[in-house]
Swiss-Prot record:
It comes from Vibrio atlanticus (strain LGP32). The lineage of its organism: Bacteria, Pseudomonadati, Pseudomonadota, Gammaproteobacteria, Vibrionales. InterPro entries: Chromosome_partition_MukF, MukF_C, MukF_C_sf, MukF_M, MukF_M_sp, MukF_WHTH, WH-like_DNA-bd_sf, WH_DNA-bd_sf. One of its GO terms (cellular component) is cytoplasm. Its main location: cytoplasm. This is Chromosome partition protein MukF. Keywords: Calcium, Cell cycle, Cell division, Chromosome partition, Cytoplasm, DNA condensation. Residues 213-241 are annotated as: Leucine-zipper.
Length: 445
């Protein structure tokens, strides 16, 4: 989510709705109008001052109308109407000055630039683009770490650390997030292509579907590897800066920015694996659909096409690929014999679960009583100390389950103010075997 969207979220909804109503904002962009806007954007980029005259807009409208023949002729009247519509929707701005002898000049608005940029610059998602963006983020993070290690006044931190993190690193993260959303759209496009293929010739459809599925799977795997490698480095850099600013109240604004970047980084890195998992499920669905369609082909249309392919082999040669699986040997008894022997085995699952629940409830009640003493006395709960003292009286094999129950009961009693201030707690040892816990002191009940 971009910084602009986050700022807008802080305002009341009714205030934002009133703002839209007051300025009469609206958008209506049929395909020909969108094409006209993109044509204006392309022509504008070719100009040094990014300004266009009315004649150039008429030329762009003529090009668009030539491709959209059903919309009508490219008359000056229709061109002026199209221009006025874009001006009314605040997509282009019209200026008139004496320098141009009263002729109007036009310039794209920020809204139009955003729309045209989406269709022109973000149409293609590539591993190279992602790699460059991740490299840029790493360079900016390195600058921030260097400035943080030097230290200085709050002004130095705000200018050389906070500014770089918020406006350089944060914006690049937003661009990466946008590119990932473009990749999501491309996956939907591939799915539509596969659906169209399955409605056509079966033999060609199977080959093309396999190609599309494999190509997209390989792309997602490469992207995930790239994200994983870069994500580990970025995570380390964020933790390094957090360690420097930890405990300094004057640098709390830097810690809050790092917390926001951490959330963005987690979302970016988790996208890759999630996209792969979803695509694997879709891949299996397509193959299952093809097998089911062949099995349920009542008219034997696929079989008929296969026989026809064999008949026409010499005119249209093809290759046949098959798999020869090894036979499985069945080692079960051919006949089952009833036996009167005593049954030996484990307790049923229901009984085991019931016994575990009884033990768990007793422990939870006992631990809850222990922690309530802190609440009654108004004393804070330092989970690190509480766990260490409590686990010391129990066998090592029980430490994991007991620690889980203690934490669960503690968070039911209260919370820590530090959690809402994005303060990262230190790791504390809770036993002599290397187990650690990271939790703020609970001081609100």
């Amino acid at each position: 989510m971009s910084e602009m969207t986050q700022t807008a979220e802080e305002q009341p909804i009714d205030e934002l709705v009133g703002w839209v109503k007051q300025h009469d904002f609206s958008l209506n962009l049929p395909p020909e109008r969108l094409a006209f806007l993109i044509a204006i954007a392309v022509l504008s980029n070719e100009r040094f001052d990014e300004e266009l005259g009315e004649g150039e807009l008429h030329d762009a409208f003529t090009i668009v109308t030539r491709l959209f023949e059903d919309t009508g002729e490219a008359s000056a009247f229709r061109a002026n109407n199209a221009i006025n519509e874009l001006v009314k929707q605040k997509l282009i701005s019209r200026f008139t000055s004496e320098i141009t002898d009263g002729a109007s000049i036009y310039r794209l608005s920020p809204l139009a630039i955003g729309i045209s940029d989406y269709y022109l610059r973000h149409r293609q998602f590539s591993k190279l683009k992602l790699s460059i963006q991740l490299s840029m983020v790493a360079d900016e993070m390195a600058k921030a770490i260097e400035a943080a290690q030097k230290g200085g006044t709050p002004g130095h931190w705000r200018r050389n650390v906070y500014g770089v993190l918020k406006y350089s690193v944060g914006e690049i993260f937003d661009q990466i997030d946008l590119n990932q959303r473009v990749m999501d759209e491309q996956q939907q496009t591939v799915k539509q292509q596969i659906a169209d293929l399955l409605n056509k010739d079966w033999r060609e459809a199977i080959n093309n579907c396999e190609s599309l599925l494999s190509e997209t799977s390989a792309t997602l795997k490469e992207l995930q590897d790239t994200l994983q490698a870069a994500g580990d480095e970025l995570q380390t850099q964020i933790l390094d800066i957090q360690e420097i600013v930890y405990g300094d109240d004057e640098l709390e604004f830097v810690g809050e920015t790092l917390f926001g970047l951490q959330m963005k980084l987690d979302r970016i890195t988790s996208w890759g694996q999630q996209a792969i998992d979803l695509w694997i499920g879709y891949d299996r669905h397509v193959h299952k659909f093809i097998r089911t369609a062949i099995d349920m082909d009542k008219n034997r249309a696929f079989s008929q096409r296969l026989r026809q392919s064999v008949t026409d082999y010499f005119d249209a040669p093809w290759l046949l690929t098959y798999a020869d699986a090894e036979k499985l040997t069945d080692l079960r008894d051919e006949a089952l014999v009833l036996r009167d022997d005593e049954v030996m085995g484990q307790a049923p699952i229901d009984v085991e679960y019931e016994e575990f629940e009884q033990v768990n409830d007793l422990l939870s009640e006992r631990i809850g009583d222990m922690l309530k003493a802190h609440k009654q006395q108004g004393a804070p709960i330092d989970l690190g100390l509480v766990l260490r003292d409590y686990l010391a009286a129990h066998p090592r094999t029980h430490h994991f389950d007991l620690a889980r129950i203690v934490v669960d009961q503690a968070v039911r009693l209260g919370y820590s103010e530090s959690d809402y201030q994005a303060i990262q707690p230190d790791w504390q040892a809770i036993n002599d075997f290397g187990a650690k816990v990271q939790a703020n002191v609970i001081n609100k009940y």
